[in-house]
Swiss-Prot record:
GO biological process, one term: DNA recombination
The protein, known as: Recombination protein RecR
Record InterPro entries: DNA_Rcmb_RecR, Rcmb_RecR, Rcmb_RecR_Znf, TOPRIM_dom, TOPRIM_RecR
Keywords annotated in UniProt: DNA damage, DNA recombination, DNA repair, Metal-binding, Zinc, Zinc-finger
Protein's job: May play a role in DNA repair. It seems to be involved in an RecBC-independent recombinational process of DNA repair. It may act with RecF and RecO.
Family to which this protein belongs: Belongs to the RecR family.
PANTHER family (alphabetical): RECOMBINATION PROTEIN RECR
Organism of provenance: Streptococcus equi subsp. zooepidemicus (strain MGCS10565)
UniProt-listed SUPFAM superfamilies: Recombination protein RecR
């Protein structure tokens, strides 16, 4: 069905979001049209504010409104461990369990040979620089249990072990193919406690 151009453009915009197909995008577009002008303005303002006011921490790569982020500036955290994750949402998931007290490093992606993504395409160089200049003695790789997550973990292990840095991986309480973001807190806690060396 053909929609008026403004609705069609809104549907197209919603369709660009991950996990949103045309049907859901259409529902969201029509819901948005039915919202009050005040709610639509607030929604638009919040979108723009998030885009303008957020940045990536210059140390760990986490999404933040202050640079460096509040985690990197917290001197009470364990300086000996850095937990490496794919995305900022994974930092939030790990922080919820309140059991990991070290620092983080966000890769902003995974090595994916099938998709043409190599080590230079993700935030790895700054991790190496950080490790060579800092006090960390262990890197915990917390990438998802997928082929790309495993490839990334093995690459990190291969480049860091010769430098004498202990590289561990979250234990397998996480199902293969699962996302850390959706794991419950007990599963994440067990995965950290029972991590294995790579």
């Amino acid at each position: 069905m053909l929609y008026p151009i403004p609705i069609a453009k809104l549907i197209e915009s919603y369709s660009k979001l991950p996990g949103i197909g045309v049907k859901t995008a259409t529902r969201l577009a029509f819901y948005t049209i039915g919202m009050s002008d005040e709610d639509v303005n607030d929604f638009a303002k919040n979108l723009l504010a998030a885009k303008r006011e957020l940045t990536y921490c210059s140390i760990c790569g986490n999404l933040t409104d202050d640079d460096p982020c509040h985690i990197c500036t917290d001197s009470s955290r364990d300086k000996e461990t850095i937990l490496v994750v794919e995305a900022s949402k994974d930092v939030s998931a790990m922080e919820k369990i309140q059991e990991y007290h070290g620092y983080y490093h966000v890769l902003h992606g995974l090595i994916s040979p099938m998709n043409g993504v190599g080590p230079d395409d993700i935030n790895l160089k700054s991790l190496i620089t950080r490790l060579m200049a800092g006090e960390a003695t262990e890197v915990i790789v917390a990438t998802n249990a997928t082929a790309d997550g495993e490839a990334t973990a093995m690459y990190i292990s291969r480049i860091l072990k010769p430098a004498g840095i202990k590289v561990t991986r979250l234990a397998r309480g996480l199902a293969v193919g699962s996302d850390i973001e959706y794991a419950d807190e007990v599963t994440l806690l067990r995965a950290i406690e029972n991590r294995t060396e790579l």
